Swiss-Prot record:
InterPro entries hit by this protein: P1/P2_N_sf (IPR038716), Ribosomal_P1/P2 (IPR027534), Ribosomal_P2 (IPR044076)
Organismal lineage: Eukaryota, Metazoa, Chordata, Craniata, Vertebrata
Modified residues (N-acetylmethionine): M1
Sequence ranges of Low complexity compositional bias: 69-90
One annotated Gene Ontology cellular component of this protein: cytosolic large ribosomal subunit
Function (record text): Plays an important role in the elongation step of protein synthesis.
Name of this chain's protein: Large ribosomal subunit protein P2
Subunit structure: Heterodimer with RPLP1 at the lateral ribosomal stalk of the large ribosomal subunit.
């Protein structure tokens, strides 16, 4: 992702076809070490393409990805009722999971940018 971001910054900054040297320079300026193989892969995939078209295609692909909330709602009607003995155990597990999530979410203020 860092290579794509650096490529996009260079392209949007006026460099129509950024080279590996351009991207490496941008990454080095923020203290990120560049992997030559990944860098060359990004350049070969994006070289000669219109950045606006690539962004539009990406937005179209993201629109087709289901969000996290819809899956839980869709699963609820199809699930069978659990046995009476297992319900308290399931409730305890859910409480424990919620506690763990709340501790983790404090680190990133409840929003995981790279999750």
């Amino acid at each position: 992702m860092r290579y794509v971001a650096s490529y996009l910054l260079a392209a949007l900054g006026g460099n129509t076809s950024p080279s590996a040297k351009d991207i490496k320079k941008x990454l080095d300026s923020v203290g990120i070490e560049a992997d030559x193989d990944r860098l060359n892969k990004v350049i070969s995939e994006l070289n000669g393409k219109n950045i606006e078209d690539v962004i539009a295609q990406g937005i179209g692909k993201l629109a087709s990805v289901p969000s996290g909330g819809a899956x839980a709602v869709a699963a609820a009607p199809g699930s069978x009722a659990p046995a009476a003995g297992s319900a308290p155990a399931a409730a305890e597990e859910k409480k424990e999971e919620k506690k763990e999530e709340s501790e983790e979410s404090d680190d990133d203020m409840g929003f995981g940018l790279f999750d």
